């Protein structure tokens, strides 16, 4: 009898607690529709069920805020200004938003759970962002670990991007086997050496990532990306490979891909100052876009140089393009430094890391490096080394432009 009474009492307590929780939830959490007031413009504002993240709500209503990490809170790009509602800023946002910015209402849309009516402000250019379903034209190796993905924009459509801009590419849940990758024989040596074909990428959720465009605005009808495969580091061989890079490497001509854009902040300044471009690896993409735009579209007479770091001749690409630009433009010079040239390369050019080569062979004897504009994109270690070198030369932050795809 005591056991039965105990079970009954326990059940009643659980039921009572459940009722209390549901009652509290009904009072504290808005489970009905809420209103998102955008820029105090009724045509841009909308109503939606409460509970989702602000980034997702905006996207579902055709407003695409930049989010290079796909809403994971790590890139800090999906900034919005919240005037009313939104609650307190979260610890996950504080590494991207300063105290001053937080006081002004700056938040990360991917971290804001919408539980009440909001009043927000968005830059006007966001409303020019669109989605397109593109078709893969080609997806070819340009280096051992870098593919050039070329996409066809739908007929009659235009992606109104600026040189240095980027798009976001979407992937549905998928499984990718590296053994199915089409890697030309000339690049297979390192793939076999490090047993990379054994990897698989299994993704259960839709994914979004950002990539800088390698084409420039007058290369119409296409989007061109340089994508480096993100394999697990040798020190952590059991780590999962890169989600989006694995997906992109699996794409074949004729496949359909959804992109959104354009986005960007890595734009050239409209001045007459000398431009120095510094790149490495897949950081080639915005370098190519910028340099082609300056010389082929704008016919710039600014002094321009491009310094690119690669491991060996096999990792160099777009050589003919830049050689031709150099031959056609007296104001442009480009230089490559190989950090690990192979015997078969018969390399007679610069060797070493690109920041050292740039310093020793150009900037050290430059009359005023602090007056130049520096545009860079490459691996994080390269970026850090270049920035330190430039700071040591007295270059101010305002003249150092970085496309920080490596975080």
Curated annotation (Swiss-Prot):
Cofactor: record remark: Binds 1 [2Fe-2S] cluster.
Annotated ranges, domain FAD-binding FR-type: 129-269
Short name of one Pfam family: Fer2
Record GO biological process: sodium ion transport
Residues annotated to bind [2Fe-2S] cluster: 69, 75, 78, 110
Reported cofactor(s): [2Fe-2S] cluster; FAD
Record localization: Cell inner membrane
Membrane-spanning intervals of the chain: 3-23
Topology term for the membrane: Single-pass membrane protein
Keywords: 2Fe-2S, Cell inner membrane, Cell membrane, FAD, Flavoprotein, Ion transport, Iron, Iron-sulfur, Membrane, Metal-binding, NAD, Sodium, Sodium transport, Translocase, Transmembrane, Transmembrane helix, Transport, Ubiquinone
PANTHER family per record: NA(+)-TRANSLOCATING NADH-QUINONE REDUCTASE SUBUNIT (PTHR43644), NAD(P)H-FLAVIN REDUCTASE (PTHR43644:SF1)
Reported function: NQR complex catalyzes the reduction of ubiquinone-1 to ubiquinol by two successive reactions, coupled with the transport of Na(+) ions from the cytoplasm to the periplasm. The first step is catalyzed by NqrF, which accepts electrons from NADH and reduces ubiquinone-1 to ubisemiquinone by a one-electron transfer pathway.
NCBIfam families xref list: nqrF
UniProt record similarity statement: Belongs to the NqrF family.
Subunit structure: Composed of six subunits; NqrA, NqrB, NqrC, NqrD, NqrE and NqrF.
The protein, known as: Na(+)-translocating NADH-quinone reductase subunit F
Naturally occurring in which organism (per UniProt): Yersinia enterocolitica serotype O:8 / biotype 1B (strain NCTC 13174 / 8081)
């Amino acid at each position: 009898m005591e056991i039965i009474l105990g079970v009954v009492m326990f059940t009643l307590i659980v039921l009572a607690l459940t009722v209390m929780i549901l009652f509290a939830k009904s009072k504290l959490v808005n489970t009905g529709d809420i209103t998102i007031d955008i820029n105090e413009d009724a045509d841009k504002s909308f109503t939606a069920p409460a509970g989702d993240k602000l980034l997702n709500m905006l996207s579902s209503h055709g407003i695409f805020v930049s989010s290079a990490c796909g809403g994971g809170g790590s890139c800090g790009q999906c900034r919005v200004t919240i005037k009313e509602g939104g609650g307190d800023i979260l610890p996950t946002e504080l590494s991207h938003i300063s105290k001053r910015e937080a006081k002004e209402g700056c938040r990360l849309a991917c971290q804001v759970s919408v539980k009440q009516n909001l009043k927000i402000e968005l830059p006007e250019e966001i409303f020019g962002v669109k989605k397109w379903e593109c078709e893969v034209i080609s997806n070819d190796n340009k280096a051992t670990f870098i593919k050039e993905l070329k996409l066809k924009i739908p007929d009659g459509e235009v992606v109104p991007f600026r040189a240095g801009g980027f798009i976001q590419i979407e992937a549905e849940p998928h499984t990718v086997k590296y053994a199915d990758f089409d890697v030309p024989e000339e690049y297979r040596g390192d793939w076999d050496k490090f047993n990379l074909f054994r990897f698989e990428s299994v993704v259960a959720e839709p994914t979004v990532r950002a990539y800088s465009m390698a084409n420039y605005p007058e290369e119409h009808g296409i989007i061109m990306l340089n994508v480096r495969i993100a394999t697990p580091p040798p020190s952590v061989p059991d780590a999962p490979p890169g989600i989006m890079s694995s997906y992109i490497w699996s794409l074949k001509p004729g496949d359909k891909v959804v992109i959104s854009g354009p986005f960007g902040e890595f734009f050239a300044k409209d001045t007459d100052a000398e431009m120095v471009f510094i790149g490495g690896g897949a950081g080639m993409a915005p370098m190519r876009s910028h340099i082609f735009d300056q010389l082929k579209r704008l016919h710039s007479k600014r002094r321009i140089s491009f310094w690119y770091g690669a491991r060996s001749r096999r990792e160099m690409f777009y050589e003919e393009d830049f050689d031709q630009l150099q031959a056609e433009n007296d104001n442009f010079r480009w230089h490559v430094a190989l950090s690990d040239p192979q015997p078969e390369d018969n390399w007679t050019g610069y060797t070493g890391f690109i920041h050292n080569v740039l310093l020793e062979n150009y900037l050290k004897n430059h009359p005023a490096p602090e007056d130049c504009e520096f545009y860079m994109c490459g691996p994080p270690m390269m970026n850090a080394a270049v920035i330190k070198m430039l700071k040591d030369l007295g270059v101010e932050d305002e003249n150092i432009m970085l496309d920080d795809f490596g975080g």
